[in-house]
Amino acid sequence: MLLTQFQAEIAQLPPTQHQFLIGFSGGLDSTALLLLFAKLREKQPHLMLRAIHIHHGLSANADAWVTHCQQICQQVAIPLIVEQVKIDQHKGIEAGAREARYQAIRQHLLPNEMFATAHHQQDQTETFFLALKRGSGLAGLGAMQRKSTLYCLPICRPLLTFTRQMLLDYVKQAGCPWVEDESNTDSRYERNFLRHEVLPRLRQRWPHFDNAVQRSAQHCFEQQQLLNELLHAEFAQHFDKTERTFQLRDFATRSQLKQNALLRLWLAQCGLSMPSKVQLTQLIQDVILAKSDSQPQFQLGEYCVRRYQDTLYLTPHFADLSSLRLPIHIGETLTLPDHLGTLSLQQQAGQLQVIWSHPQHTFTSILPLTEDPIEVRFRYSGKVRLSPTSANKDIKKLWQQHAVPVWLRQRIPLIFYADRFKSAVGYFNAI
């Protein structure tokens, strides 16, 4: 019966969705999810399953949990990835652990895989109450959906309609052991406080309380979807789907309410969690309304919202590369820092071909051969002469002519012959 219901949930996903990465802590809920996927694979052999266990290092039992998860996954023939993470406790243990967890998962998720979590009906109620406590709007009160994007990860939650008791009965019947995380009883954590001290009394008073909360969450989600639909035409005027940027042209003519809604819709399209009202107001004041010649940015979780001219960009936090000087020789390939790809120098037809293989594009520059030492740098603030007949130009003007945003200028490899600037690879060369 439970497997039939689970199969129906998976059937609601796109028909081409056959690959799943299962979040597996070893606890009751994720054990039920793992077993259900393993059983479903017997009926649907085309399913490609992997599991991932995140070692947070917060419990003395963490190593034992890894061993347990490895044994269970071996029994059901599902490959297991174990990833140990470091938690930034300045963000709080709960928030820091969640962010570290999803960062690790994102590194392992394959292009056609979907991350599957074991959230069930009682988890949904807790999520709704936590959103209520934060003063969330429709998007937050919509709680968790069967399929969504979080931290830029495609996620499915096929157990949302299942109660914890159903999962408990299923795992017991399967005779499969699970682990208990001792922190789950610590009511200092908000979710545990709700789970142990608040919600049991409500369920005792109203036995169908979880069903009612789930209906309310669904109503909120549907109202938010309707609002997004009504905003679609105006949003399309601002959103560049390819670059995931937000154009500010005519933005100031919108009402404050509509400005907030359009920005939230943009951030949601980019897979970010919703900012608070205070954060949204600060984003508008510090970035959108900043002087046109400034370099405004606003930190939002793992990302930065930046503005260049009349466009908002969403970028990761970048490392400071300004002091780097990387030697390179002809015939070599250099791995560039901070996920910028590789750069190679090849001698070709009496010239030097510089190839920058960036994860998104490939850039090429052709330079004269030299016997001088060659370096790759990421910062230069002097003058550039493009041809024998042209005047020296400030490099800042050249970046502006190529419409390169300020923060990207220090992420483009610059070629130097000794101390002479020769090329911004893929953009312009000096004589």
UniProtKB/Swiss-Prot annotation:
Its main location: cytoplasm. SUPFAM superfamilies: Adenine nucleotide alpha hydrolases-like, MesJ substrate recognition domain-like, PheT/TilS domain. Keywords: ATP-binding, Cytoplasm, Ligase, Nucleotide-binding, tRNA processing. It is found in: Cytoplasm. It catalyses: cytidine(34) in tRNA(Ile2) + L-lysine + ATP = lysidine(34) in tRNA(Ile2) + AMP + diphosphate + H(+). GO terms for cellular component: cytoplasm. The keyword Amino-acid biosynthesis does not apply. Pfam families: ATP_bind_3 (PF01171), TilS (PF09179), TilS_C (PF11734). CDD domains: TilS_N (cd01992). GO terms for biological process: tRNA modification. It is an enzyme of class 6 (ligase). GO terms for molecular function: ATP binding; tRNA(Ile)-lysidine synthase activity. ATP binds at residues 25-30. Its EC number is 6.3.4.19. The keyword Ligase applies. Ligates lysine onto the cytidine present at position 34 of the AUA codon-specific tRNA(Ile) that contains the anticodon CAU, in an ATP-dependent manner. Cytidine is converted to lysidine, thus changing the amino acid specificity of the tRNA from methionine to isoleucine. HAMAP family: tRNA_Ile_lys_synt. Belongs to the tRNA(Ile)-lysidine synthase family. NCBIfam families: lysidine_TilS_C (TIGR02433), lysidine_TilS_N (TIGR02432). The N-terminal region contains the highly conserved SGGXDS motif, predicted to be a P-loop motif involved in ATP binding. This is tRNA(Ile)-lysidine synthase. The gene is tilS.
